[in-house]
Amino acid sequence: MDDPSATLLPEHSEDLRLARDAELKKVLKLKLVLDELRRLDVGPNPSDEIKRALKLVSIGSYARLGEMEGAGQEQVLGLPSGSSFPPLNYTDRKTVRTKLSAQLRTTLQPIAELCDRIREEFPDAFGQEADLSCDQKEILRLEEEHRSGLEKLVALLTRKCTLLKETAELKLGPQLANELKLQQAQAQLVQTKAELLRGFFVHEAASRTEHSVKAHKEVEAHLDELLAAKK
């Protein structure tokens, strides 16, 4: 059976490809924005964090939006075909960076300003306990216990390391002094043995040499007597 896709006209296939590429560009741009939004840490001072995000979007790796840098490139939203989007030219990349920066600034700055204003006007609003269910309260309680247990464990491990260090210093201090004295005593003992052996060998060599000369003379005299008797 013939492939139904083979009946499509070439211009129709080109239009479909261009439409697919355009949609993939939109998906990729949205994914980049969402990834950067997820990295935001809206803490006590979110303005600095938002400025950091805007800076990353402006001069970060998004400048190469659409470029292929290897087979291990992340797929767009898990779509295998998401990595086949066409590369963007310089104008497109600049437009994307400008629009991303403008959209982030327009969307996030009012949120940050509102958050700062709420914190100033209602400083105790965020400290009040939320209306949580029993299960949620239990989860929070267990999380607090877990965090408290970890803090206690860290404190105990730190205390243990300190005690081990102090014990090692107390133990090794006198021990090293005693070992040094022992090494000195052993060295003196070896030196004394060497001196005794040297004196013994000198004495033995001198005494044995004297006896050897005397015995040699006696044997020589005895041989002379035997030779004279044979004549």
From Swiss-Prot:
Coiled-coil residue spans: 128-199
Tissue: In adult females, detected only in the abdomen with no expression in the head or thorax (at protein level).
GO cellular component, one term: spindle
Keywords from the UniProt entry: Cell cycle, Cell division, Coiled coil, Cytoplasm, Cytoskeleton, Microtubule, Mitosis
Top-rank taxon, per record: Eukaryota
One GO term of the biological process aspect: cell division
Record-level Gene Ontology MF annotations: microtubule binding
Keyword Lipid metabolism: no
Compartments reported by the entry: Cytoplasm, Cytoskeleton, Spindle; Cytoplasm, Cytoskeleton, Spindle pole
NADP keyword on record: no
Oligomeric and partner information: Component of the augmin complex composed of dgt2, dgt3, dgt4, dgt5, dgt6, msd1, msd5 and wac. The complex interacts directly or indirectly with microtubules and is required for centrosome-independent generation of spindle microtubules. dgt2 interacts directly with wac (via coiled coil).
Note: The name 'dim gamma-tubulin 2' derives from the decreased gamma-tubulin staining of the spindle pole seen following RNAi-mediated knockdown of dgt2 in S2 cells.
Biological function: As part of the augmin complex, plays a role in centrosome-independent generation of spindle microtubules. The complex is required for mitotic spindle assembly through its involvement in localizing gamma-tubulin to spindle microtubules. dgt2 binds to microtubules in vitro.
Entry protein name: Augmin complex subunit dgt2
Species of the source: Drosophila melanogaster (Fruit fly)
Gene behind the chain: dgt2
